[in-house]
Curated annotation (Swiss-Prot):
Gene Ontology MF annotations: ATP binding; UMP kinase activity
Activity regulation statement: Inhibited by UTP.
Record's GO cellular component terms: cytoplasm
Chief location of this protein within or outside the cell: cytoplasm
Name of the gene: pyrH
Protein name as catalogued: Uridylate kinase
Species name: Sulfurisphaera tokodaii (strain DSM 16993 / JCM 10545 / NBRC 100140 / 7) (Sulfolobus tokodaii)
Length: 226
């Protein structure tokens, strides 16, 4: 299989060494089983910190996005160095560079590409370019809920849903300003739909279960494109 793994910036914010060890072991197992893997890292609180300071000082949205992109590349380099025996040692900065590095057969790890989108769009573009079997969004919740689980105790996890349902759920939190994206930005959803990319949302604390979740044997959400 060809897999794209998008690691939420929150993974980096937690600074949990066990999570990093588990990620490294999972990636080694996936590669040893003969699958190909690309990883996209989010910008997390480092991106938000720089964007917040810049915004308060009147920096424009394009420049704020660039700050976010560089923060996501910093996270991408952390993963690159942690996985140096498997990974391509340069973080690609656009889709052409990514495609070129992918030919190396190594795990290619990337952050942001260009302003106006989030790293979820990068993950969707990369998935499209390599015809990935699955795009896996590893975040700090177990999957997609019918309501925001942070504010609704009765929120239910949806094990299967389509992009139409997802768009309705995300409607309340959608924004295109730097640093404000939640899970998937509108452009990422458009790309997922136009190329019918299958998306899995799962908790990064259960990364060792990726293959089980893909096969519907463990907790997570599978999003079918409409
Ligand atoms: N960003 C971009 N383009 C990209 C990736 C990220 O402009 O291709 C910026 C956005 O401002 C985004 C921030 O909110 O970097 C951090 O990425 P993310 O963690 O929100 O995905």
């Amino acid at each position: 299989m060809k897999l794209v793994l998008k690691i939420s910036g929150k993974f980096f914010d937690e600074e949990n060494i066990e999570n990093f060890i588990s990620l490294r072991n999972t990636i080694k197992n996936i590669v040893n089983e003969g699958h190909r893997l690309a990883i996209v890292s989010g910008g997390g609180s480092t991106a938000r910190k720089y964007i917040k300071i810049g915004r308060e000082l009147g920096v424009n949205e394009a420049h704020l996005d660039l700050l976010g992109i560089w923060a996501s590349r910093l996270n991408a380099y952390l993963l690159t160095f942690i996985l140096s025996d498997l990974s391509y040692m340069k973080v690609p900065e656009n889709l052409e560079e990514f495609i070129e590095k992918w030919e190396s057969e190594k795990v290619v790890i990337t952050g942001g590409f260009q302003p106006g989108q989030s790293t979820a769009t990068v993950a969707a573009l990369v998935s499209e370019a390599i015809a990935a079997d699955y795009l896996i969004l590893a975040t700090n919740v177990d999957g997609v809920y019918d309501k925001d689980p942070r504010y609704n105790k009765d929120a239910k996890l949806l094990s299967k849903l389509n992009t139409e349902t997802l768009k309705k759920i995300l409607e309340t939190s959608q924004s295109v300003k730097a640093g404000t994206y939640e899970l998937l930005d509108p452009l990422a959803i458009k790309i997922i739909e136009r190329s019918k990319i299958k998306v899995i949302v799962m908790n990064y604390k259960r990364l060792n279960k990726i293959l089980d979740i893909i096969h519907g044997k463990d907790i997570g959400s599978i999003i079918e494109p409409m």
